[in-house]
Amino acid sequence: MIKQALISVSDKSGIVDFAKSLSDLGVKILSTGGTAKLLADAGLPVTEVADYTGFPEMLDGRVKTLHPKVHGGILARRDLPEHMAALEKHDIPTIDLLVVNLYPFVQTVSKEECTLEDAIENIDIGGPTMLRSAAKNHRDVTVVVDPADYATVLDEMRANGNTVGYKTNFRLATKVFAHTAQYDGAITNYLTSLTEQLQHRDRNTYPATLNMAFEKVQDLRYGENPHQSAAFYRDIAAPAGALANYRQLQGKELSYNNIADSDAAWECVKTFDAPACVIIKHANPCGVAVGANPHEAYSKAFQTDPTSAFGGIIAFNREVDETAAQAVAKQFVEVLIAPSFSEAAKQLFAAKQNVRLLEIALGEGHNAFDLKRVGGGLLVQSLDAKNVQPHELRVVTKRHPTPKEMDDLLFAWRVAKFVKSNAIVFCANGMTMGVGAGQMSRVDSARIASIKAQNAGLTLSGTAVASDAFFPFRDGLDVVVNAGATCVIQPGGSMRDDEVIAAADEHNIAMVVTGIRHFRH
């Protein structure tokens, strides 16, 4: 039964209402510093921890709750007579509810002007100590680290005579240990990233020790293949616009492959300003287009490769209206992603309950780093988020691209970044015309892209081509030009650049180089 609570929070959202409800239930409230003042100013009966322990706060607040009267009241097992006798001997009441969240360390060190001293002063000591004590003794103590749990605790107390059940206490305790582990991990990441100058602005991007925290979203039926088990986890700091923050409106449970392909589709479509549609199959774009509206964008994207689009993942960067929904509904679709769906579109897809509809906020946020597991290790790199601008391009041929060709080149280059290497992408008029992906030789990717266009009944005459890396020989260039391309965008940097550029001049096409590569493995 909860008779006494200790409340000390940095995040004060909802705390006054929560404390008032506790007081109304007859719970005595202990508190510290700013939290105590906030509660007292709200007219709530509150006892300062310093008055409770008989020992004042000291060392500029570094020592507040590190006292036997606090930790004894938290850690004592109520089922052990010797523990309870020790409390009685030293006149220590039990503390049955602990409500604590920690100094904002992560927010502090994320500021550019943060110094080591600022960071050190935001390392909480008393808070984690109390939290761990309460979580360890969760059989007897309810511990709350997240304001989202206030309502649950109050509901159980009201229903059960100020008692919170063991199942809830256990869940809250596991939440505490996850929280303190994350907190300590953030401290370790920060301290091991410091250079010899020990200033925040001189931090190494990659700390000596890397700690990451993820929370489980769901178990999955299986992994990439049916014999593999799997689960989906969300980065606790996932930005609003990330796939992990999706809201599923309808459809079957997402599979491992659905999630992986959906991420590829969403990250690609977010890069376009105009209404865009991206169709993904096996993590590769098989159709990308922009248009005046979602319907036009989808119609153009679908034309690229109708065969591969069957059972694909489709993403839009605009609301899916009824017209677009009617077009999409004619095909077999696994997942449909958009910032929103009109009511008419929702009603239309309600008749197709197997189609998974995902809404995701169209934010600019994306992962800061790209991670790849290898045997016994982890590769970490900054995200390939570079979007080349026209003024950054260098024309290396005698013929310069026309304004229309330049638009097509930039579109093709944007798509190529999301195609598995080796990547060759034909584009024209804001749509992909042929995509060659994942081949061991660039010339084979060029041939496949050409064949794909031919199979879809598309002409490549007058198209722009993007190559995610340089042409090592002229053979790949010859293939795309013979297919109909009139301009090419590529990184440059090959030992045979002169030979490739000479071939471009021989064909009288325009070629621009970006100076950056977009390998994707």
UniProtKB/Swiss-Prot annotation:
Sample GO molecular function, one term: IMP cyclohydrolase activity
What catalytic activity does the UniProt entry give for this protein?
(6R)-10-formyltetrahydrofolate + 5-amino-1-(5-phospho-beta-D-ribosyl)imidazole-4-carboxamide = 5-formamido-1-(5-phospho-D-ribosyl)imidazole-4-carboxamide + (6S)-5,6,7,8-tetrahydrofolate; IMP + H2O = 5-formamido-1-(5-phospho-D-ribosyl)imidazole-4-carboxamide
Q: Which residues cross the membrane?
A: none
Q: What InterPro entries does the annotation carry?
A: AICAR_Tfase_dup_dom_sf, Cytidine_deaminase-like, MGS-like_dom, MGS-like_dom_sf, PurH-like
Q: Which SMART domains did the record assign?
A: AICARFT_IMPCHas, MGS
Q: Does the keyword Cytoplasm apply?
A: no
MGS-like domain location = 1-145
- Please give the record's comment on domains: The IMP cyclohydrolase activity resides in the N-terminal region.
**Family in the record:** Belongs to the PurH family.
What is the name of this protein? Bifunctional purine biosynthesis protein PurH
